[in-house]
Amino acid sequence: ESAPDPGPVHVHGLGVDPADETLYIASHTGLFRLPRESSAATRVADRYQDTMAFTVTGAGRFLGSGHPDMREDLPPFLGLIESTDAGESWVEVSLQGEVDFHLLAASGSRVYGFGSVWGSNEAVFFASNNGGESWTKHGPPESLIGLAISPSDPRMLIASSARSLFLTQDGGKTWNRSPGSPGLLAWPQPDRLYLADSKGSIERSTNMGQSWRQAGRLPGPPSALGFGSGELFAATHNGAVLESRDQGATWSERFSP
């Protein structure tokens, strides 16, 4: 008799597929789908891939990174991987065996990633303008825990370390310290940038992170922040997924482990 499915453990990423507004939950124990009107998360493709970084780039199109399912003959660092069938299958784009991306952000053909390099203690910020096929390395300002790309300018990103926020307007070549407390980031609209700090406070900025106001509060510390179709999504450390339909002011449980 097989062991029960553990469900999503240690949620790293949340994203909505614009094809059908299904929420995808990327976790240490695999990728799960949560249809719009459902509270039951189902494992995608019976795969236990540790999806460390995850972002939705289009209808059924995802980028990811992390570590393979133990049953697959793949190196421990997946590099950049892509799915064009909503997570049913993944193919290597680049850097397999070389890089473990912890954070990914993409807009059009521009892809950015922060992660660790195999065989070194080095953490690197990578930028690509051809969908991740080739990369330029930039030194990140500090080790990063959050990354979001502007919906209106693919060269503008805001990043968070454990201590500070940073803004780049040239695709990661240069970074300037930005006001605000550190945290996880989501940037659904040019004038709506969200941050979830380590205590669960939700902050909102309407001016690209130059100033912040508290919008609401999560019931606990967040492990992931995401958005889709007018909603914000957050995962807490116990594995619950919450959603807000009023710009972060109030939150309701969407999935409970």
Range-by-range predicted roles:
Residues 19-21, 59-60, 108-109, 154-155, ...:
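Short coil/turn segments that connect the beta-strands within blades of beta-propeller domains
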